[in-house]
Amino acid sequence: KLLTDNDIPTLNEINNIMETIQQNNDEKAFLILSLAVKCALTNTEICSLNKEYIVINSNDEMYINYPPKGNNRISRIIKVPDDVAVLLDRYICNNNIIEGAIFINKRKTRIKLRDTERLLEKYCKLNIEKGMLNNKFTMQTLRHAAICYMLSGGASKDLVASYAGITTKWITRYDKIINSDTYKQAVDYSIISINA
């Protein structure tokens, strides 16, 4: 299915949601949504994130190294943007996470997919009530937005597909959006960058 402009939140809408989260001092929600928007992580990847998957290279750059799973047996390595790396490091320190799940729920167990969707829904509703948002978005639409902004920012389809952990055949579903006037004008090259 080709995606349209209406399927993807704009930078202003994402910004409004993030500002509302900051105003509510919700460090966990801010980090979760940052991982979706700036790293194009899936909801499943966010919920399954373990401390052991986080690595720092010799240049002090943070990466997430998801172990191989499924039939392809290929690990996925994601470069974490510096601003998100600071948030993630602070969250780990503030919550004294030594090992295991990065995100836990109120029951002190690993956060579930529905928990993250509820977090996002809560802040979408607050923005709808303030007239700052027209539609609710899902974790998947935030990931779609991340991919669209990378493509709009000039990253190659192959590089974006590799970073997002998908095949290039799936990238064509974003063509209509990145070629629309809305995204040509709205793209903010600083929101997401990919270094080859």
Listing of model-derived features with the role each one plays in the protein:
Residues 121-162, 166:
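Short, basic (Lys/Arg/His-rich) helix/loop patches that form interaction surfaces
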Residues 173-196:
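DNA/chromatin major-groove-contacting recognition/catalytic segments
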Residues 14, 28-30, 113, 117, ...:
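Short, leucine-enriched amphipathic alpha-helices that occur as contiguous helical runs
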Residues 35-48, 153-155, 164:
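A short, glycine-centered helix-capping/turn motif at helix boundaries
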Residues 1-16, 107:
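Flexible interdomain linker/hinge and immediately adjacent N-terminus
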Residues 11-41:
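Basic, Lys/Arg- and aromatic-enriched nucleic-acid-binding interface segment
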Residues 70-89, 100-122:
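C-terminal catalytic core of Y-nucleophile DNA break-rejoin enzymes
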Residues 48-84:
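Conserved tyrosine-mediated DNA breakage-rejoining catalytic core shared by Y-recombinases
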